[in-house]
């Protein structure tokens, strides 16, 4: 940091504060700066766009307006409100953390960094956001937006995900927040995040609208579009999966609950699973349903094929009505099984893919009785 051409933290902070205080977006979590609202919004915003988060935040706060109501809720209720937002471990951690805060801190989010970091799902970034935005403490934040802004302002040409660069970026973020007035830590951090979200975006940043373009080294060197450097992307693997829509004689649908641990843990959905290499879809329905719930089924009409991207892989979920040939459903490779009516389907915490199956069923007016040859008792 001894190089004379590096932007002074105080100059960057001053320009950012003037800009964010005049132009920040009106978002629902900014209208109430209490620690609970800050915490919920920051967790929801992890790897999720603001426009997506807003309705989920409003629905969450209507159902769980405080720590106590969240702690007292059932896991099913928490996952149902979260359903569709993805990365479901976040919801489970929020629930566990609320219960720990009630048990260990009397229902009050702690204002000490050490106590915050001891809670499940709280890392350095989330702790810094809560401490600065809600408590006004001079704690730095470093998310994807802030990382990009700092790499450009200081023209950092190293891999931003490397350990040494990560330490450097945290040091720069700390110097910036410490250079701001004592009561402006939250505004400064919000300015960094807002700038990265709206102006200093990936690809081609809008430098003409940037309040700190005049002190940005990457802009001065004409390399802003090249910062931060990007690692080569590998194409995520793709898998086909089966989802069996099974009805009983009363016209109820069979749902399974996934185990609490792992991807989509605790959520409900239609029985099935990932197809094996070389396995045709029809065979996949038979095998996955047998392994998961112990039923022998015969696939029938295809309902939908739904593509979906997760963080590290992609799937195409094939949904088909399946007729029971033999057996009674039992939770062999799932946490629970349940027969539910068509009207009850939307009351369960379903992943996006399974919710789309429900929508397809509603569009195509499925039969209320099993296909010919189904069980009679």
Identify the residue ranges that each predicted region occupies.
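Acidic pyrophosphate-coordinating catalytic loop
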Residues: 233-237, 261, 306-318
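Conserved hydrophobic/aromatic beta-strand scaffold that supports enzyme active sites
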Residues: 209, 255, 317-321, 337-339
């Amino acid at each position: 940091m001894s190089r004379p051409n590096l932007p002074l933290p105080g100059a960057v902070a001053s320009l950012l504060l003037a800009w964010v205080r005049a132009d920040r977006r009106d978002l629902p979590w900014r209208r109430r700066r209490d620690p609970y609202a800050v915490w919920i919004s920051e967790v929801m915003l992890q790897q999720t766009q603001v426009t997506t988060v807003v309705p989920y935040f409003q629905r969450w706060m209507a159902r769980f307006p405080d720590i106590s109501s969240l702690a007292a809720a059932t896991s099913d209720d928490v996952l149902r409100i979260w359903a569709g937002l993805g990365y479901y471990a976040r919801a489970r951690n929020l629930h566990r953390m609320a219960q720990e805060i009630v048990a260990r801190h009397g229902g009050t989010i702690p204002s000490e960094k050490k106590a915050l970091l001891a809670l499940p799902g709280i890392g350095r970034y989330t702790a810094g956001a809560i401490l600065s935005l809600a408590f006004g403490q001079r704690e730095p934040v470093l998310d994807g937006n802030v990382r990009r802004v700092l790499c450009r302002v200081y023209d950092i040409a190293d891999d931003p995900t490397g350990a040494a660069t990560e330490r450097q970026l945290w040091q720069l973020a700390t110097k910036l927040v410490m250079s701001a007035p004592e009561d402006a830590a939250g505004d400064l951090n919000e300015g960094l995040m807002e700038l990265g979200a709206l102006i200093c975006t990936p690809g081609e940043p809008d430098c003409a609208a940037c309040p700190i373009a005049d002190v940005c080294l990457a802009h001065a060197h004409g390399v802003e579009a090249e910062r931060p450097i990007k690692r080569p992307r590998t194409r995520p693997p793709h898998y086909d999966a089966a989802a069996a829509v099974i009805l009983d004689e009363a016209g109820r649908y069979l749902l399974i609950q996934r185990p609490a641990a792992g991807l989509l843990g605790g959520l409900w959905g239609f029985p099935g699973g990932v197809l094996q290499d070389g396995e045709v879809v029809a065979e996949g329905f038979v095998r996955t349903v047998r392994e998961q719930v112990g039923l022998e089924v015969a696939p029938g009409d295809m309902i939908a094929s739904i593509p979906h991207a997760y963080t590290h892989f992609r799937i195409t979920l094939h949904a088909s009505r399946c007729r029971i040939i033999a057996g009674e459903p039992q939770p062999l490779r799932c946490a629970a099984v349940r027969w539910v009516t068509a009207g009850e389907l939307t009351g369960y915490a379903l992943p996006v893919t399974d919710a789309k199956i429900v929508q397809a069923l509603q569009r195509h007016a499925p039969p209320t009785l099993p296909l010919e040859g189904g069980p009679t008792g």
